[in-house]
Structure formats: structure tokens, C-alpha cells
Amino acid sequence: MENPVLIQKAPRRYKSAIPLFLFHDGGGTVLPYYFLESLNRNVWGVSYPHLNDGGTFEHGIKGMGELYAGYIRGKVSRGKVLLGGWSAGGSIAIQVAKCLENIPELCVAGIILLDTPFPDFPDWRPKNSPPVQFHIPVVPDQTAKSRLAQQQAVNDIIHALSVWELPTWENGRRPPPAVFIRALKVVPTEKVVEVDWFREEYALGWQKYPYNFIVEELRVDGDHFSIFTPSYLPELSTKLREALDLLDSKPETGILLDSKLNSSIVISAL
């Protein structure tokens, strides 16, 4: 499996646009991103590498961030990149941004959090209860071994999020600027699902993260899952292009490490 995979190739007139790397959701796949309209740039999708082999990350989200940062450096050697993801993918994007923080050749120009709930969930299960099983649909011709590995991947990603310690930025640094896209509706179930615990809060609770890095919240019709259905995809694609335009033009001053002088200097983002 190619990873990352080029989901959209930039049209000729957008060849110089900042590339976007979108990270997998809690299911480990990047399939939803294939349904988006053109985002006018190269769009790469990063899948969970153990989706089919049953492997795990020893260091959870932090381990994913380090590996995925390496993936990005393999595709873009220098310049600007944009990061983002739907649901769990947004949290992973923040960790990857932290892992790229001291890479002098690369600048994370911004992050898109696509309906990513703040990972501060209540303790809603007894401590000794077994891990939650997040069931996935049956794929035609899928072997029992493959399905078991895929189910294991889902559970591992969700567990990694539940114990993740969000990265901290020090010495005047902060996360790259982010645009949050929030679905307006709740998932139509009898009980409130986890993704809707902060549904009415700005940026689904991310104001609790003490860096004031979200520069804009955009809103789309639909719920957490339906935004990728045909009825809502045109609006979602439009909002994503709007978010990307905002980040493309956002001047951001940060502290980067000068590789030649081996000292910290304040410069404008490349």
C-alpha cells in the first residue's frame, strides 16, 4: 500500500499551491477524502500503516506523528506544507506539526481541523471494562484475518487518542494557525455519541487548548458522518477551499531553528 498516496494532483495553474497532507480518521483510512471536489493543490492522504497487518504503535499518537512527519519529508524536502484531517485526523495533524517544529527546511503553514472533537472525553466506562469495539462495515471478499486486523487498527487508534497527551509549545512558540470546520447537526441516535459531546461549543472544545491558535471557525450543514455524503459534499468542499485560502494568505511569525547558526531566530514563515 502506497503511503502517503496522492489523492488529488494540482491543476497546472495551481502547481505552486502549498501541498495538503490529510491524515486518516479513527477507522485508519483516507477513503472519505477521495470524494472531495478539487482543492486546487496536491492533496496527499496518509493512512494508518497497520490497517491490514494487525500491528500497533508502541507510542500511540506520538509515534504516529513521528512516522508521518517522516512520510511528509519524503515527499516535500523543503518549503511550506499544510496539514489536516477529519475527526481523529485533526488531532494527528497537531502531533505531526509538533514533530516538524524543529525541521528548518519545512514550515507548517497551517492546520485544518475537520470536525475534530477536543480529546478531553469524560470517563464514561468502568476502568476494568474491556476496550470499546468500534465496528466497521463488512467489505466484500474481505478475509476474516483482514477484517480482524482492520478492527484491531480501529480500536488501537481510538485507544491511542484516549491516552494522548497533547503536545506543548514553549519559549513563545505555538501551534501553526488552524481553521476549524464544524458540522452543525448531531448524529441522529438515541444517545449522544462521543463526537457530539462538545457539539455546541466553539471548535468542539478546542478553546481548552491554551494557545489560541484557531483563527477561524467555518460551519457546514450535516452531522459528523453525513458531511461526506453526496448531499453535503459540495458545501464541505467549498468550505475546505475557503479554509485553505485563509491559511495560504495567513502571515505567521514563529520561532524556527536556523540550521547554519544552530540558534533560534524569529522569522516570518517561509
Swiss-Prot record:
Signals that turn on the gene: Expression of the botcinic acid clusters genes BOA1-13 and BOA17 is coregulated by BCG1 during both in vitro and in planta growth.
Protein name (database record): Probable thioesterase BOA10
GO annotation, biological process: biosynthetic process
Biochemical pathway: Polyketide biosynthesis
SUPFAM superfamilies attached to this UniProt entry: alpha/beta-Hydrolases
Pfam families cross-referenced by the UniProt entry: Thioesterase (PF00975)
Primary role: Probable thioesterase; part of the gene cluster B that mediates the biosynthesis of botcinic acid and its botcinin derivatives, acetate-derived polyketides that contribute to virulence when combined with the sesquiterpene botrydial. Botcinic acid and its derivatives have been shown to induce chlorosis and necrosis during host plant infection, but also have antifungal activities. Two polyketide synthases, BOA6 and BOA9, are involved in the biosynthesis of botcinins.
EC code(s) of this entry: 3.1.-.-
Protein family membership: Belongs to the AMT4 thioesterase family.
InterPro entries listed in its UniProt record: AB_hydrolase_fold, Thioesterase
GO MF annotation list: hydrolase activity
Database matches in Gene3D superfamilies: alpha/beta hydrolase (3.40.50.1820)
Keywords recorded for this protein, A-Z: Hydrolase, Virulence
